[in-house]
C-alpha cells in the first residue's frame, strides 16, 4: 500500500515521502495515528501545493531578515556610560541596553538575539553580533563614550 507520510517515522521516512508499506501496518498503525495519508493523486497535489507555499513563506522571511541585517550593518550605536579614571565602566554595557538603543533607532530586536563576545566594560569601539535568523546574522558597531 502506498502512503504519503505526514510525520517523520523512524525506519520508514520523513515528512512528504511516498512509501510502500504492508496494508496491515498502514491500516492498524500509520493511518489511525495520523502519521500518513493514502497516496492518491489528489493528496499528492495537495502535498506539492503545501510544500510550495511553505517554501514561499520561508523565502519571504529570509528576505525580510536580510533586509533587517542590512539596516543593522549600516547602523553605529553610541552609548554614553559613566566611567572611572582608567576608562573602565561602572557596570557593563549589556545586550538589553543595545536592544533599547536599536529600538530607539526604529529596529525592534529581542535582547536574546544580541550576542556579545565578552561584556563591554571599557570605553571604546566594539562589535556585537545580532542573530536575526538561523541563516542571517549582522554585525552591530557600538561606540562607548564617557557620560
From Swiss-Prot:
SUPFAM superfamilies, alphabetized: L9 N-domain-like, Ribosomal protein L9 C-domain
Gene Ontology terms: biological process: translation
Domain of life: Bacteria
Annotated Pfam families: Ribosomal_L9_C, Ribosomal_L9_N
Cellular-component GO terms for this entry: ribonucleoprotein complex; ribosome
Coiled-coil segments on the chain, per record: none
Keyword set, alphabetical order: Ribonucleoprotein, Ribosomal protein, RNA-binding, rRNA-binding
Bilayer-crossing regions: none
Any one GO molecular-function label of the UniProt entry: structural constituent of ribosome
Cross-referenced HAMAP family: Ribosomal_bL9 (MF_00503)
Record-linked NCBIfam families: L9
Family: Belongs to the bacterial ribosomal protein bL9 family.
Function, in words: Binds to the 23S rRNA.
The protein, known as: Large ribosomal subunit protein bL9
Upper lineage: Bacteria, Pseudomonadati, Thermodesulfobacteriota, Desulfuromonadia, Geobacterales
Name of the gene this protein is made from: rplI
Amino acid at each position: 500500500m502506498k502512503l504519503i507520510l505526514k510525520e517523520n517515522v523512524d525506519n520508514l521516512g520523513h515528512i512528504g515521502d511516498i512509501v510502500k508499506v504492508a496494508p496491515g501496518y498502514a491500516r492498524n498503525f500509520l493511518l489511525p495515528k495520523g502519521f500518513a495519508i493514502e497516496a492518491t493523486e489528489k493528496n499528492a497535489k495537495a502535498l506539492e501545493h503545501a510544500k510550495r507555499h511553505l517554501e514561499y513563506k520561508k523565502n519571504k522571511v529570509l528576505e525580510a531578515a536580510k533586509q533587517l541585517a542590512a539596516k543593522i550593518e549600516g547602523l553605529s550605536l553610541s552609548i554614553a556610560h559613566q566611567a572611572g579614571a582608567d576608562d573602565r565602566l561602572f557596570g557593563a554595557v549589556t545586550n538589553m541596553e543595545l536592544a533599547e538603543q536599536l529600538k530607539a533607532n526604529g529596529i525592534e530586536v529581542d535582547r536574546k538575539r544580541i550576542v556579545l563576545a565578552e561584556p563591554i566594560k571599557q570605553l571604546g569601539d566594539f562589535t556585537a553580533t545580532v542573530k536575526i535568523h538561523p541563516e542571517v546574522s549582522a554585525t552591530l558597531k557600538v561606540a562607548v563614550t564617557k557620560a
